[in-house]
């Protein structure tokens, strides 16, 4: 590597060079020549061809630089210089290519054809290369390096270790059965359960025995018969579903015949197509087609002019008569109905309306229904309940009359059910027993019958 030398060495070398130049000038005898274009050209050519200037520069720089060992910094500087020179060279080449004359040439048929052929060839070659390399990529056949294999094993072991740690942490708590508080709690729970069981058993034993009574035996027999009937019906239904049914559509003969019919229809269709092939030809430039096309355009223009004359003089805000406005209106209507149905299916259908009772329309309908109910109630009260133990006068309030009417209706229904359903089933209904005792006895019998 060449590096500059100190100042004293430079001065000495310069003095020696000056002395040598003076000696050379003294030796060479100069002759005047006529300066013309040929002489200038010759001088320039000789300067370019000969290496005189190179030798002079070499002699001038001689002893000014000395060779030293390469250091990392010097190597870095050399590499950077090489990269910088390459970047400058590429930049100049790109600038020259962008300003080349070939780019400004007019496109000819041959150049366009050559460009298209080259593009097609590049696409064909790329596709062939892609098809050839499909399924044979290097990534699929790449061997696993030791680092990747080591990382996979470490990840697998770490996942197992963490999973086991979490599992052990969740199962660390184990209850001790020999603790005094647990023993005491179990004993108390057993005592409470025994007491409740005995209490319930005593209540059951206090009830009168119903085993051996005729009505109870009859109910047991009826329940057995009904269970047998239901079991037979269920068995018959299951056997009907599982019984063998002949399905002609699923037979092999029918499927074969159907397949043959399909093949025959395809063959007939192909034969008709081959026979009629070439008989029909649609010519867009035929006189008949052009005549029909002209008539259609004339008719459309006549209709458009009629609509225009009809709507002439009307304001531009009235879009009802125009076909585009009508089509947009119908489309908007259909879209709104579709959106409303979607919202109804998603949000409203199947859900209870929360704010429906707060709307004015609903409140109005509710008020009207209340008035109609009061009117119907008063009419029924005057027609049916009057003369049945209650005097109707203007001094009696509507609330008292309604209360008395409801009590009479409930007593009537209760007595009718009691006489028709419960009487004759082991209980004598007399006028001396209280209504509360009769109702209690009836409820007990009904519960016993349901239990049986």
UniProtKB/Swiss-Prot annotation:
Biological role stated in the UniProt entry: Binds to actin and plays an important role in the assembly of the Z-disk. May functionally link sarcomeric actin to the desmin intermediate filaments in the heart muscle sarcomeres. Isoform 2 might play a role in the assembly of focal adhesion.
Oligomer and partners: Interacts (via nebulin repeats 1-5) with DESM (via rod region). Interacts (via SH3 domain) with XIRP2.
Entry's localization field: Cytoplasm
Domain of life: Eukaryota
UniProt keyword annotations, A-Z: Actin-binding, Cytoplasm, Repeat
InterPro entries, per database record: NEBU/NEBL, Nebulin_repeat
PROSITE patterns, per database record: NEBULIN
One Pfam family from the record: Nebulin
Positions annotated as Nebulin repeat: 29-63, 64-98, 101-135, 138-172, 173-199, 206-240, 263-278, 279-313, 315-349, 352-386, 389-423, 426-452
Keyword Repeat: yes
Annotated segments matching region Disordered: 1-26
Gene Ontology, cellular component aspect: Z disc
A GO MF label: actin filament binding
Name of the coding gene: Nebl
The keyword Repeat appears for this protein: yes
Biased composition (Acidic residues): 11-23
Protein name per Swiss-Prot or TrEMBL: Nebulette
């Amino acid at each position: 590597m060449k590096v500059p030398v100190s100042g004293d060495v430079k001065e000495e070398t310069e003095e020696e060079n000056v002395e040598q130049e003076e000696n050379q000038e003294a030796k060479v005898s100069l002759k005047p020549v006529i300066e013309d274009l040929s002489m200038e050209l010759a001088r320039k050519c000789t300067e370019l061809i000969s290496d005189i200037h190179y030798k002079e520069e070499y002699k001038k720089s001689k002893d000014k630089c000395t060779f030293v060992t390469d250091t990392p910094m010097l190597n870095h500087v050399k590499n950077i210089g090489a990269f910088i020179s390459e970047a400058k060279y590429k930049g100049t080449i790109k600038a020259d290519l962008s300003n080349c004359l070939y780019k400004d040439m007019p496109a000819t048929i041959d150049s366009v054809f050559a460009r298209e052929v080259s593009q097609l060839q590049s696409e064909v070659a790329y596709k062939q290369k892609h098809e050839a390399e499909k399924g044979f990529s290097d990534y699929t056949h790449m061997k696993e390096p030791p680092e990747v294999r080591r990382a996979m094993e470490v990840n697998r072991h770490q996942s197992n270790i963490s999973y086991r740690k979490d599992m052990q942490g969740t199962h660390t708590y184990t209850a001790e059965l020999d603790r005094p508080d647990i023993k005491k709690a179990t004993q108390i729970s057993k005592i409470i359960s025994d007491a409740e069981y005995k209490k319930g058993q005593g209540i059951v034993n206090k009830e009168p025995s119903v085993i051996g009574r005729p009505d109870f035996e009859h109910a047991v027999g009826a329940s057995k018969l009904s269970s047998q009937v239901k079991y037979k019906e269920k068995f018959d239904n299951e056997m009907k579903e599982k019984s063998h049914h002949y399905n002609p559509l699923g037979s092999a003969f029918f499927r074969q015949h159907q397949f043959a019919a399909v093949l025959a229809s395809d063959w007939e269709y192909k034969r008709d197509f081959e026979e009629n092939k070439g008989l029909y030809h649609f010519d867009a430039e035929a006189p008949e087609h052009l005549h029909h096309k002209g008539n259609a355009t004339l008719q459309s223009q006549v209709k458009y002019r009629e609509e225009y004359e009809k709507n002439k003089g009307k304001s531009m805000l009235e879009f009802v008569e125009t076909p585009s406005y009508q089509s947009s209106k119908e489309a908007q209507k259909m879209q709104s109905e579709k959106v409303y149905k979607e919202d109804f299916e998603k949000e409203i259908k199947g859900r209870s309306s929360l704010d429906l009772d707060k709307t004015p329309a609903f409140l109005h309908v509710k008020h009207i229904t209340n008035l109609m109910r009061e009117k119907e109630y008063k009419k029924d009260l005057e027609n049916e309940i009057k003369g049945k133990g209650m005097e109707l006068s203007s001094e009696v309030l509507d609330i008292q009359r309604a209360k008395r009417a409801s009590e009479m209706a409930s007593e009537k229904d209760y007595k009718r059910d009691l006489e028709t359903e419960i009487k004759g089933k082991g209980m004598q209904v007399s006028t001396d027993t209280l209504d509360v005792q009769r109702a209690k006895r009836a409820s007990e019998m009904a519960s016993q019958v349901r239990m049986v």
